[in-house]
Amino acid sequence: MYTSGYAHRSSSFSSAASKIARVSTENTTAGLISEVVYREDQPMMTQLLLLPLLQQLGQQSRWQLWLTPQQKLSREWVQASGLPLTKVMQISQLSPCHTVESMVRALRTGNYSVVIGWLADDLTEEEHAELVDAANEGNAMGFIMRPVSASSHTTRQLSGLKIHSNLYH
């Protein structure tokens, strides 16, 4: 089979480009905190948005931590969702007053690729800043899940990832 010299040049270029990308990502922080406000009557929409990201993060060697207030994750759901059962940890029955503190501690360790916590109330600016610092320090992602009823809406949102979708409007 014939291969041109161009193919060899492009592969050496892509090798150099990947080396530069790797060095530049090592020098930047990749932590992220995002508040995900979802309607209680449409939980599948949130799953459709977050599952691909969680599946990708599941390929890392780190754990995924779920801090749930009441419900327990079922093994069947975790496996059916394509998440690695051996890398998913859950702490349930966690009091809302301990959720932010637990998230900060977990994010800071660097042992988790993602930490997901449920909160009914808005974060204070201090709590948000503390979570952002912890996520940056641990190079991790944190998601604050906030269910709202279909009739209510939020008045403000702190800076972070905003996902706009026609499915929610």
Curated annotation (Swiss-Prot):
UniProt keyword list: Cell cycle, Cell division, DNA damage, Septation, SOS response
Cell cycle in keyword set: yes
GO biological process: division septum assembly; DNA repair; negative regulation of cell division; SOS response
Tagged with keyword Oxidoreductase: no
InterPro entries: Cell_div_suppressor_SulA (IPR004596), P-loop_NTPase (IPR027417), SulA_CellDiv_inhibitor (IPR050356), SulA_enterobact (IPR047696)
Region (FtsZ binding) location: 106-112
Post-translational modification: Is rapidly cleaved and degraded by the Lon protease once DNA damage is repaired.
Pfam family membership, one: SulA
Subunit structure, interactors included: Interacts with FtsZ.
Reported function: Component of the SOS system and an inhibitor of cell division. Accumulation of SulA causes rapid cessation of cell division and the appearance of long, non-septate filaments. In the presence of GTP, binds a polymerization-competent form of FtsZ in a 1:1 ratio, thus inhibiting FtsZ polymerization and therefore preventing it from participating in the assembly of the Z ring. This mechanism prevents the premature segregation of damaged DNA to daughter cells during cell division.
Record protein name field: Cell division inhibitor SulA
Organism of this sequence: Shigella boydii serotype 4 (strain Sb227)
Organism lineage string: Bacteria, Pseudomonadati, Pseudomonadota, Gammaproteobacteria, Enterobacterales
